[in-house]
Amino acid sequence: MLCLIFLLFSVSFSVQAEIYQWSDTKGNKHFSDRPYQDAQTLHISPGYTYHYVKKVYDGDTILLANGKKVRLLGINTPEVEGRNKTAQAGGEQAKRWLQKKLQNKKVRLLKDVEKNDKYGRLLAHVFTEDKQHINLELVEKGLASVNIHPPNLKYTDQLLKAELLAEQQRLGIWNYKEYQPKQANQIKQARFQGWQRVIGQIINIRHSRKYSYLNFSDTFGLKIERRSSDLFPELESYVGKKLEARGWINKHKNRYSMFIRHPSQLKVINSR
């Protein structure tokens, strides 16, 4: 038994471990991480490491007691006021909810393909000790929108189902005028900050070496990396259709664009 305990503590807690058990001719049980003849496989679930949350920066970023920042995967919450940042509608509500839920509490992190973002923050789905999925709860309550960054695709289906329900019930951000859909031809008339929803008809598609552009007009296009095109339906199938695009509006010279990383950012609007 002591050998089994030693083996369990020797195995990384983040990896599913296989331990083998067999009996010798005297009936004594033995355990190893290597398979022996006639050995039985024991499937040992990994243990979990929990971290204390020291600070909540906003609705989707926290600081652990070990000094590491964590950006919650698969979601986006509105900004709160800070250095070089203007407060956005719903940002403080998301932050307060997360503070109440997590500050000075213990959490478990579940990572995806990419471990860190370009700012050095850990990327993770965050779970409480009683197994509540915080990323998902933020979406369920309308405090966050879904924001998928391939190749990090864990829980995509669950997040999108929760978002659809929150939108249908007009919870949180889905009831703010700031996040109601704007017509594509209105974009040049005003400056819209933060995450937005834009509606328009795709008139054509243009390809460059690195990107494809689904164009609402000569001055506004949806920008998709060509290397990510296998995640989408045939891009040509969008031409002529009315879409709602979700993301951040960028301006370069006299042209506007929205970077589309995942097909969940595009909603086909059925014409009746």
Which residue stretches match the model-derived regions?
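Cleavable N-terminal signal peptides
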Residues: 3-5, 15
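Small beta-barrel nucleic-acid-binding modules, primarily SNase/OB-fold domains
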Residues: 15-272
